[in-house]
Design a protein with these regions (language model features):
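Conserved, mostly hydrophobic/aromatic
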Residues: 12, 33, 112, 168, ...
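Glycine-rich phosphate-binding active-site loops on the catalytic face of alpha/beta enzymes
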Residues: 112-114, 172, 218-235
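Terminal or standalone catalytic/regulatory effector modules within metabolic enzymes
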Residues: 28, 34-35, 39-52, 281-287, ...
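N-terminal small/glycine-rich loop or linker at the start of catalytic domains
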Residues: 1-19, 70-87, 130-144, 185-194, ...
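Acidic, compositionally biased tether/linker regions
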Residues: 345, 423, 432-522, 602
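Structured functional modules or segments
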Residues: 500-602
C-alpha cells in the first residue's frame, strides 16, 4: 500500500513563498498535517536554508527544532549530495557534521541526490546518515537528454545498496517523465536495486498526477505531495487528489484528506490572491515546452526584464539546451540547472558564446562537481581552459577547522559551524542577529523571573521579530513590557546571477496614474528603506532611469526581513522621496514613475 510524503512545510519556507506565512502559522500548518497520516513531513532543504539565512530572523536549525516539538510524524530533509544545502561542494567532515546536526535536531529521513547522478558523491553522506541512525533515501534525477536516461539511471541504481541506501527515490524536477516512462523506470529500478522505490515529481506539463499513479502501479510505495493550493501554484502533485485517486483504485493511502483541506484553508488565507511567478501561463508554457523547471524559467525571465530584453526568453531557453548538451547532459536539478542557465544568459546578452565563463560553469566542465553523464564537448573544454588559468578550481574544500579559524570564534556550536561553512559571511550576519535577539530576550526575562511571564515575553519578542510593526506594548496584572524594533541598518549579501530563489517580494502600493500621468509608489509596510542590496553597492534605481515591470526598486526591511519592492509599470523614475537607510511608514511616498509604453513580454 503506497504511503505519501508531504512537502508543504518545505515549500512554504523557501522562495517564492518564503515569508508569506509567519512562523507561527507554519507551525500551525505542521500540527494539522501531523494528524493527516503522512509517512513523513519533508520540512527543510537547500531552498529553506538559503531563504532562512538571507532573511536573518532565525536559524534553519531553530525552525526544525520548533517543528519537531510540535509533531510526531517523522521529519525529512532534501539534500544535494556533496553540496548539501548550498551551491558549492563541501568537505567530507563538514558533510558528516551537518548530517549529525540534522539528526540531533530531529531529522529522521534524508532524501539525498547528487546533482550529476554521480552516486559515488553520495558515499560520505550516506555513511554519515547510517551512523546517525537515519533513513537514507538515495535520489536519482530524471532529466531528458540525448539517449539512454532510463538505462543510465538503472545502472546507477544497482550501486545504491552498497552505499547503504534504504530506498531509491526517482526525482523528476521538470515534469518530463511521462506516465508510461515513469512506470517503466520505477519497475526497472526496483528490480535492479532490490530496494523500495519512492517517486517525486514537479513541473508545469500537467502530467504529475498521472505519472505518480503510474509509478504506484509499477511498485512505488512512497510518493511526494503537497496541499492543493501549493500543488496548483508550484506545479506539484496534490495530496488530496492523489489520495482520492488511490482510494478509487482500491489502494487506500491512509490519508485523512479533511486535514489537508484544513491546512489548505490556513495557507489560502495568506497567499490565496497573491500572484506567484511560476504560475504565470507564459512561464508554465515555456517550462513545459523546453522541459525546464518552472522556477528556473521564471528567474531567467526576471533577469531578462531587468535588462529590457524580455522578448529574448525563448532565445535563452534554446541556449540553455545547447549549453547543457555541450556540458555533457547534466541533470537540471539545483544548483546545476542554475549554472547552465547563467552561462546561457551570458551568451545571449553578450551576443557571443563562451566569451565569458562563470566560475561555476568552469568548475562543472573541469570536473570539480563530479562526472557528467556524457563527455564534455572538446571544443568547449578547450575554450574554458584557455579562458582561465589552470588553478581556477580551488584546492579541497575547507575543513571544519579551517572554517572555525576563519570565523574567528563566531561559531559557538557545530550547527553554527556548518552554516558558516556553506553560507560564509551571510551566515555570520545571521548569527550576529540571532545573538542580538537572544540578548534582548535575556535582558527582558532577567527583569522578571516568573516562568509564565518569561514565556509571554519570549512570545512578544517573536511577534515583533516576525512582523513589520515598530513597537508593541502590553500591560497585564501589573506588568508592562514594551518591545521596540531596532533601527540600526544591516547589509545584504550579494545576489546570485541566476537563482531559483529570490528575495521576498512585497506588494507595493502603486496608485493609478492621476491627471499628471505619474504613478506614485508607496511603502506597503512600516520598515527601513534601502536603495541598494548592500552597503557600498550601486542603488537599484536612480532618478532618470527607465524601469520595467517586476524590476526591483528598493528593499524594505521589517525586523530583519528584507522585502523587495518591485515596479508594476514600465516607466522613468522621476523622483525618489526617501533617503537610504531611513525609516518609512505604511503608505509613505517612496517613488514617482512616469509610465512609458514597452513591447509586450513573450
Amino acid at each position: 500500500v503506497p504511503r505519501l510524503v508531504d512537502t508543504t512545510i518545505r515549500l512554504l519556507s523557501q522562495e517564492p513563498l518564503a515569508g508569506r506565512l509567519p512562523t507561527a502559522e507554519i507551525l500551525h500548518v505542521a500540527e494539522i498535517l501531523d494528524r493527516a497520516g503522512f509517512a513523513c513531513l519533508e520540512v527543510s532543504g537547500g531552498g529553506v536554508f538559503d531563504a532562512t539565512v538571507r532573511r536573518r530572523v532565525e536559524t534553519p536549525w531553530e525552525r526544525i527544532r520548533a517543528i519537531r516539538t510540535r509533531v510526531d510524524t517523522p521529519l525529512g530533509i532534501a539534500l544535494r549530495g556533496r553540496f548539501l544545502v548550498g551551491s558549492q561542494p563541501v568537505s567530507g567532515d563538514i558533510v558528516g557534521r551537518f548530517i549529525a546536526c540534522a539528526a540531533e535536531n530531529g531529522i529522521e529521513v534524508f532524501r539525498l541526490h547528487d546533482p550529476l547522478n554521480d552516486v559515488s558523491n553520495l558515499r560520505e553522506a550516506g555513511a554519515a546518515i547510517t551512523n546517525a541512525g537515519g533513513a537514507f533515501h538515495a535520489g536519482l534525477v530524471y532529466s531528458p537528454g540525448r539517449t539512454g536516461e532510463t538505462d543510465t539511471l538503472v545502472e546507477e541504481a544497482r550501486k545504491l545498496p552498497d552505499l547503504g541506501a534504504t530506498r531509491v527515490i526517482v526525482n523528476d524536477p521538470t515534469g518530463a517523465l511521462l506516465p508510461h516512462r515513469a512506470q517503466e523506470l520505477v519497475a526497472r529500478i526496483k528490480e535492479a536495486s532490490e530496494l523500495p522505490v519512492g517517486f517525486y515529481v514537479q513541473g508545469s506539463a500537467g502530467t504529475g498526477l498521472a505519472a505518480a499513479l503510474a509509478a504506484v502501479e509499477a511498485g512505488a510505495d512512497l510518493v511526494a505531495t503537497t496541499v492543493y493550493p501549493l500543488a496548483l501554484t508550484l506545479h506539484r502533485v496534490s495530496g488530496e487528489s492523489l489520495a482520492e485517486s488511490l482510494q478509487g483504485l482500491g489502494q487506500a493511502s491512509g490519508l485523512d484528506t479533511d486535514r489537508l483541506w484544513e491546512a489548505a484553508d490556513v495557507i489560502d488565507e495568506h497567499i490565496g490572491d497573491e500572484p506567484v511567478s511560476p504560475i504565470a501561463p507564459r512561464i508554465a508554457v515555456r517550462a513545459a515546452e523546453y522541459d525546464l523547471p518552472s522556477g528556473l524559467v521564471a528567474a531567467l525571465d526576471v533577469h531578462l526584464r531587468a535588462h529590457t530584453a524580455a522578448d529574448r526568453l525563448e532565445e535563452v531557453l534554446e541556449e540553455v539546451g545547447k549549453v547543457r548538451a555541450e556540458a555533457g547532459w547534466p541533470p537540471l536539478a539545483a544548483p546545476i540547472g542554475q549554472i547552465l542557465a547563467s552561462q546561457a544568459l551570458l551568451h545571449v546578452l553578450e551576443a557571443r558564446r563562451y566569451g565569458t565563463v562563470i566560475d561555476e560553469f568552469r568548475a562543472l566542465v573541469q570536473g570539480a562537481y563530479g562526472e557528467t553523464p556524457e563527455q564534455i564537448d572538446p571544443t568547449v573544454a578547450r575554450a574554458v581552459a584557455l579562458l582561465a588559468p589552470p588553478a581556477v578550481i580551488e584546492d579541497e574544500p575547507l575543513t571544519a577547522e579551517d572554517v572555525r579559524e576563519q570565523a574567528e570564534g563566531l561559531a559557538a556550536s557545530e550547527e553554527e559551524l556548518v552554516l558558516i561553512a556553506m553560507f560564509g559571511t551571510d551566515a555570520e550576519e545571521l548569527l550576529r542577529f540571532v545573538r542580538a535577539r537572544h540578548s534582548r530576550e535575556a535582558a527582558l526575562i532577567a527583569e522578571d523571573a516568573d516562568a509564565e511571564r518569561a514565556e509571554r515575553i519570549r512570545e512578544l519578542v517573536k511577534i515583533v521579530q516576525e512582523s513589520g510593526v515598530g513597537e508593541i506594548e502590553i500591560e497585564d496584572e501589573g506588568m508592562r513590557v514594551s518591545v521596540r524594533r531596532a533601527d540600526e541598518p544591516a547589509g545584504l549579501g550579494a545576489l546570485p546571477v541566476v537563482a531559483s530563489t529570490e528575495t521576498a517580494v512585497a506588494p507595493s502600493l502603486q496608485t493609478a496614474p492621476p491627471a499628471d500621468g505619474v504613478v506614485r509608489v508607496e511603502s506597503p509596510m512600516v520598515g527601513v528603506f534601502y536603495r541598494s542590496p548592500s552597503p557600498g553597492a550601486p542603488p537599484f534605481v536612480d532618478v532618470g532611469e527607465t524601469v520595467v515591470p517586476e524590476q526591483t526598486l528598493c528593499l524594505i526591511e521589517a525586523m530583519k526581513l528584507f522585502n523587495e519592492l518591485k515596479a508594476e509599470v514600465a516607466g522613468v523614475v522621476r523622483s525618489i522621496h526617501v533617503d537610504n537607510a531611513q525609516p518609512v511608514e505604511f503608505g509613505q511616498l517612496l517613488f514617482e514613475i512616469e509610465p512609458v509604453l514597452v513591447p509586450p513580454a513573450v
